[in-house]
């Protein structure tokens, strides 16, 4: 089943004269066709903003943890291994944040069954209210193995020229990694980061950008929608649907990059590339009372409780 929804005129940044946005709903019946289209855009649109929707957080790890980041990874580990993807959104843009002339954004819909798969009732109800059709997911959703195989051959992974853009990305990359390997996430966080570096060698997490001294004075806080609102970045599409959230991620990233970094980007980028908010050493990056919020002031709610996707 091929379907698409159109937003208002505008590219990732909502610029006047940009193409009309077309969010393609991708199911099993058209997944190969849409990945073929994606392969045609890789060279000229190498920035891939990505968002996932999944059935919440159902498990909390118990035990003694070395740090908040250690706890956070164990929570990602438990939940990603237990749960299934519901949607993945890709918005591909060029180095100016512009969509292809066709305005394509992709929203992949995965096979999901209330009878067989685990979920958080609260999270699933939120997604249902956002318009996700769970009957279609059960009947025509994409099996994870099919998506992982097509993603592997898409030209989007293992290439450092492809830049992945995310917002609080631990769960996002966790689910993508699981779809590619078809196995559980590594128990050790260091192994997870090695796999991430191999598959997604260039990636930036907006939540990490917000911790840099460049952004400190703006005091941008909250989830993706709240940060976008503070920057006057307009959403196209429906909140809590992965295609719209991916597009908003792209627009927000390029607004931050232009407004706060300018000629300084090439100095900052190597320091934050590959970091995921709440994991690794991310909570100690740029850690000072003068430059950004202190560790105790900004609990990574995107990893403890309901993920901060939008």
Curated annotation (Swiss-Prot):
This enzyme catalyses: Exonucleolytic cleavage of poly(A) to 5'-AMP
What positions does the entry give for a divalent metal cation 1 binding?
51, 172
Tissue specificity, in the record's words, reads: Highly expressed in the germline. In particular, highly expressed in germ cells that enter meiosis and progress through the pachytene stage.
> What happens when the protein's gene is inactivated?
RNAi-mediated knockdown either results in sterility or a reduced brood size. RNAi-mediated knockdown disrupts the arrangement, differentiation and maturation of oocytes in the proximal region and as a result small oocyte-like cells arrange in several rows in the germline. RNAi-mediated knockdown reduces miRNA-mediated deadenylation. RNAi-mediated knockdown reduces ccr-4 and ntl-1 protein levels. In another study, RNAi-mediated knockdown does not alter the levels of let-711 or ccr-4. RNAi-mediated knockdown results in reduced global poly(A) tail deadenylation.
Q: What class of enzyme is it?
A: hydrolase
Q: Which UniProt keywords apply?
A: Cytoplasm, Exonuclease, Hydrolase, Metal-binding, Nuclease, Nucleus, Repeat, RNA-binding, RNA-mediated gene silencing, Transcription, Transcription regulation, Translation regulation
Instruction: Tell me any Pfam family this protein matches.
Output: CAF1
Q: What's the protein name?
A: CCR4-NOT transcription complex subunit 7
Can you name the source organism? Caenorhabditis elegans
């Amino acid at each position: 089943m091929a379907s698409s929804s159109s937003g208002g005129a505008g590219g990732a940044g909502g610029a006047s004269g940009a193409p009309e946005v077309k969010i393609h709903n991708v199911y099993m019946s058209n997944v190969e066709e849409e990945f073929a289209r994606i392969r045609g855009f890789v060279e000229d649109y190498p920035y891939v903003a990505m968002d996932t929707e999944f059935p919440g957080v159902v498990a909390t790890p118990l035990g003694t943890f070395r740090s908040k980041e250690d706890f956070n990874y164990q929570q990602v580990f438990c939940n990603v291994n237990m749960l299934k993807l519901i949607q993945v959104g890709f918005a591909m843009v060029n180095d100016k944040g512009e969509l292809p002339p066709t305005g394509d954004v992709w929203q992949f819909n995965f096979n999901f069954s209330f009878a067989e798969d685990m979920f958080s009732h609260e999270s699933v109800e939120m997604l249902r209210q956002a318009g996700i059709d769970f009957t279609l997911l059960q009947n025509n959703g994409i099996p994870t193995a099919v998506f992982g195989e097509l993603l592997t051959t898409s030209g989007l992974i293992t290439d450092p020229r492809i830049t992945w853009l995310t917002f609080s990305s631990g769960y996002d990359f966790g689910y993508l990694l699981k779809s590619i390997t078809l196995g559980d996430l590594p128990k050790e966080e260091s192994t997870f980061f090695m796999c991430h570096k191999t598959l997604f060698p260039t990636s930036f997490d907006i939540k990490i950008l917000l911790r840099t001294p460049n952004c400190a004075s703006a005091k941008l806080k909250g989830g993706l929608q709240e940060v976008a609102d503070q920057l006057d970045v307009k959403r196209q599409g429906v909140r809590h649907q992965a295609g719209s959230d991916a597009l908003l991620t792209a627009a927000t990233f390029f607004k931050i990059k232009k407004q706060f970094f300018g000629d300084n980007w090439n100095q900052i980028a190597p320091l934050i590339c590959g970091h995921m908010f709440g994991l690794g050493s991310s909570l100690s990056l740029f850690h000072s009372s003068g430059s950004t919020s202190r560790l105790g002031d900004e609990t990574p709610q995107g990893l403890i409780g309901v993920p901060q996707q939008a």
